């Protein structure tokens, strides 16, 4: 089983990318696709679904995102496509909703019934509360701000890799306008530093 591959995205079309790694082109289905850009070099965690009806490889930015995917597809009536739709909402947001047992918010996701949302929380709440217990469970508003920040920076024309850098290094998640301002400063500082080393 291949856990991850390191390569470059040479093609992107919505939620499908081709990851070139060691001279091979790998067709991979992703979620939350604004995080990815053509030409980006990255480590992509993989999960392959192979049976009589389908052979498809799914890709994830982090191991925890992949772990959440495998946990979701272990739930009755949740297949890979539905799990990817759930993760499309931002996997960290979903993980925190599960840890908080907020099935009502999860049920607002397309194709997720109240019954499925409740089952997800019952089956996975304790596990994901433990996984993220080293951090304080983020409030819903904070997660929403991060999502809005990503959308704003994307509209401003920043690349997915720059947006991820800003989100991972930002110091506050309270006020969106301050987050945007700090993110732009972080990205421009990083770009300037990269230019000096090249």
UniProtKB/Swiss-Prot annotation:
One of its GO terms (biological process) is DNA recombination. Pfam families: HHH_5. Has three domains with a flexible linker between the domains II and III and assumes an 'L' shape. Domain III is highly mobile and contacts RuvB. HAMAP family: DNA_HJ_migration_RuvA. This is Holliday junction branch migration complex subunit RuvA. Keywords: Cytoplasm, DNA damage, DNA recombination, DNA repair, DNA-binding. The gene is ruvA. Residues 144-198 are annotated as: Domain III. Residues 140-144 are annotated as: Flexible linker. Residues 62-139 are annotated as: Domain II. The lineage of its organism: Bacteria, Bacillati, Mycoplasmatota, Mycoplasmoidales, Metamycoplasmataceae.
